């Protein structure tokens, strides 16, 4: 009954996303040397999974400098914000059809992530030691979102042109599933990598900071 009460366009969106796995999976020939295939392989099997490595290294640097007793919950919450700024466009790029809406979100998120990164460092250096190696790790974390965005833009140059022209078609500003979804095995594997290498470590960091804040508050 609730579905029947929705507008026609909304119904179309619901049905489209309900059947988002029905299309043929995107296939990238492993032996192809075409620029488009090579770029897509680098993005999906290089940039995105390897993004976890500097993220995990940064978490270790925070732990080593005992973030829970220095900048504490405030900085850890900023890290959670930055993961959200990076995570939303990644999920959209993996599941949704790349169009002006998705590209605009990706661009806005990249700018927000960069601004938050500057605030994060300015906050951290006042409260704890930020070593040169950690600053170098930050460089990777700042450039990788831009790298992913650049490769996505090159793979969808037609949509970049539409974005620059204001997205004249109605579907340019609708969130739609990919015509050829990424293989379920790939999505599951990447989700496991992100969960184990990003979500769990930083959740542990935030929990550690909250517990330390409670402990310090009770001693006052």
Describe each PLM feature range.
Residues 1-220:
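Short amphipathic, positively biased membrane-proximal segments
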